[in-house]
UniProtKB/Swiss-Prot annotation:
The keyword DNA repair does not apply. GO terms for molecular function: structural constituent of ribosome. Belongs to the bacterial ribosomal protein bL28 family. SUPFAM superfamilies: L28p-like. GO terms for cellular component: ribonucleoprotein complex; ribosome. GO terms for biological process: translation. This is Large ribosomal subunit protein bL28. Keywords: Ribonucleoprotein, Ribosomal protein. Pfam families: Ribosomal_L28. Disulfide bonds: none annotated.
Length: 78
């Protein structure tokens, strides 16, 4: 699976990390992807979206649990 945002398409980029002594090391910057269950057109989908899209897009809301789903009770400790 690609390391890419499902909404904006943000992916990994590569470049050089430059230290204080101007030493260049190759490195990779990766987006902050989160696996989220989102409601799109009335149906819930699993998507990997970046944190910026999740924070900034008011239409992207996490899917709520079903109203008629039974709640799981904690098992008693013995």
């Amino acid at each position: 699976m690609a390391r890419r945002c499902g909404l904006c398409g943000k992916g990994t980029i590569s470049g050089c990390a430059v230290s204080k002594s101007m030493h260049h090391c190759k490195r990779v910057w990766k987006p902050n992807l989160l696996a989220v269950r989102v409601v799109v057109d009335g149906s819930a989908l699993n998507m990997r979206i970046c944190a910026r899209c999740l924070r900034s897009n008011p239409l992207m809301k996490k899917a709520q649990p079903r109203a008629n789903a039974p709640l799981r009770a904690a098992a008693p400790k013995l």
